[in-house]
UniProtKB/Swiss-Prot annotation:
Its cofactor is FAD. The gene is mqo1. GO terms for molecular function: 2-hydroxyglutarate dehydrogenase activity; L-malate dehydrogenase (quinone) activity. This is Probable malate:quinone oxidoreductase 1. Its EC number is 1.1.5.4. The lineage of its organism: Bacteria, Bacillati, Bacillota, Bacilli, Bacillales. Gene3D superfamilies: D-Amino Acid Oxidase, subunit A, domain 2 (3.30.9.10), FAD/NAD(P)-binding domain (3.50.50.60).
């Protein structure tokens, strides 16, 4: 049975952190807008935003070495690191505003202070990290970062990583107490709870079948109720596709020119999770290493303290897996169905160019549990097999697109696609993703609500005081804002 519903102002597809953030921003900036949300699963934040489906790192380049690039002359380019840190500052300011205004309570349910650290082995890598820290510390955003090669100091930070270490190779660690662990699933659920209280229609177990533009300029979105099997068509002035790995297939259904010559490559993640509480309680940090030469950015190994429902956990990974699914709950046909006449050359070109990625994935798929444990022992020399179990994390779909220079380029990062008229936006890609959700959604609003955005700026600056500024260039403003953020989020 198919029914036609009346028009709405905004449709958000996907019940993750991106839709939750965009919906919250719109209700703050334009409360009269009628918003509907459609999610395929039974509750919000259960795919990419789920606490076990991502690393929970508040990505701010305090520990992620792949956000800084080393030149042939030994200089380190920190521009990407500064940008990502600035984006995370925006997220923290918005969350602090929501706590301050009573829309989020008990911030420790979704954010915890956890030191962020980098770890390297070998003379060349030690030289790199020294140069990296020296360059980063020129910015106020990284003023609290410490570097050490002193065994006792390093042991005081991460005893498990120093005890039992026998190699003569030099090691170095950085330490920044301002790092965080974020439960994006808990945050997403709370944001949607607030939106429901503000009149937003959030419907679960809803599968979006089609998205088509009308001559009037509005969009028709066909949705199937997975419980009743009824199909309903909704009309909306604006559509946002924030459905994780399912965003690409949904974008392709729109037929907009920006959906052409773009593809996706799914990668799944495996982690080792510690089952020994005594071990878990002796490590309190997110420690990121350096990816092997030739390995993709997604392969950066890290030993992570996590907080889930108030309980501390310890994970190590990721190890790449392969599944043709675009979502953890998706179909094995997702990858095949995403190949279209307009992107087949794009996909094939990427396959030819990215042989190193293919080799990496094959090598990861061949790993035994003992080999995974050997990788862990690079970080934690005394790790015991019996204390760790393998868990499967979420699916990520890496974007493949044509650029002006060449076809089939694999993109690492998060990408916003918008129609020419700004009536539709889609979010594709992976890390840093959720950490930068607020800044990304500001980008969506600027591109899709061009006429209204200028009038919204005073309210935006109330919610995010640094909006329009680069905090790295305004030390006093950073300290003033950070004091407020620390007060409300209860982090450092």
């Amino acid at each position: 049975m198919t029914t036609q519903h009346s028009k709405t102002d905004v449709i958000l597809i996907g019940g993750g952190i991106m839709s939750a953030t965009l919906g919250t921003l719109l209700k703050e900036l334009s409360p009269e807008k009628n918003i509907k949300v459609f999610e395929k699963l039974a509750q919000p934040g259960e795919e990419s935003s789920n606490v076990w489906n991502n690393a929970g790192t508040g990505h701010s380049a305090l520990c992620e070495l792949n956000y800084t690039k080393e030149g042939k002359d030994g200089t380190v380019d920190c521009s990407k690191a500064i940008k990502i840190n600035e984006q995370y500052q925006i997220s923290k300011q918005f969350w602090a505003y929501l706590v301050k205004t009573g829309q989020l309570d008990n911030p420790d349910r979704f954010i915890q202070a956890v030191p962020h650290m980098s770890f390297v082995i070998g003379e060349d890598n030690v030289a790199f990290i020294k140069s990296r820290v020296a360059t980063l510390k020129k910015s106020v955003l990284f003023e609290k970062m410490k570097l050490s090669q002193d065994e006792e100091e390093m042991k005081s930070w991460v005893p498990l990583m120093i005890e039992g270490r026998k190699s003569d190779e030099p090691i170095a660690l950085t330490y920044d107490e301002t790092g965080t662990d974020v439960n994006f699933g808990a945050l997403t659920a709370k944001l949607f709870e607030n939106l429901e209280q503000r009149g937003v229609g959030i419907q679960y177990k809803q599968n979006v079948l089609d998205i088509k533009k009308q001559k009037s300029g509005a969009w028709l979105v066909k949705v199937k109720d997975l419980e009743t099997n009824e199909t309903t068509t909704y009309e909306s002035d604006f559509v946002f596709i924030g459905a994780g790995g399912a965003s690409l297939p949904l974008l392709q259904k729109t037929g907009i020119k920006q959906s052409k010559h773009i593809g996706g490559f799914p990668v799944s993640g495996l982690f080792l999770r510690c089952t020994n509480q005594e071990v878990i309680d002796r490590h309190h940090a997110k420690v990121y290493g350096k990816a092997a030469v030739g390995a993709p950015p997604m392969s950066v190994p890290h030993l992570d303290t996590r907080f889930v429902d108030g309980k501390r956990s310890l994970l190590f990974g990721p190890f790449a897996g392969f599944s043709p699914k675009f979502l953890k709950t998706g179909s094995h046909m997702d990858l095949i169905k995403s190949v279209k006449p307009n992107n087949i050359v794009t996909m094939l070109s990427a396959g030819i160019k990215e042989m190193s990625l293919t080799k990496y994935l094959v090598s990861q798929l061949m790993l035994s549990n003992d080999e995974r444990m050997d990788d862990l022992r690079v970080f934690f020399p005394n790790a015991k097999n019996e204390d760790w179990e393998v868990i499967t994390a979420g699916q990520r779909v890496q974007v493949i697109k044509d650029t002006e220079d060449s076809k089939g380029n694999l993109q690492f990062g998060t990408e916003v696609i918008t129609s020419d008229d700004g009536t539709l936006a889609a979010l594709l890609g992976a890390s840093p993703g959720a950490s930068t959700a607020v800044d990304i959604m500001f980008d969506v609003l600027q591109r899709c609500y061009r006429d209204e955005f200028k009038g919204w700026e005073p309210k935006i600056k109330e919610m995010v005081p640094s909006f329009g500024y680069r905090l790295t260039d305004h030390e006093d403003l950073y300290h003033k804002i950070n004091e407020e953020v620390t007060k409300y989020l209860q982090v450092k």
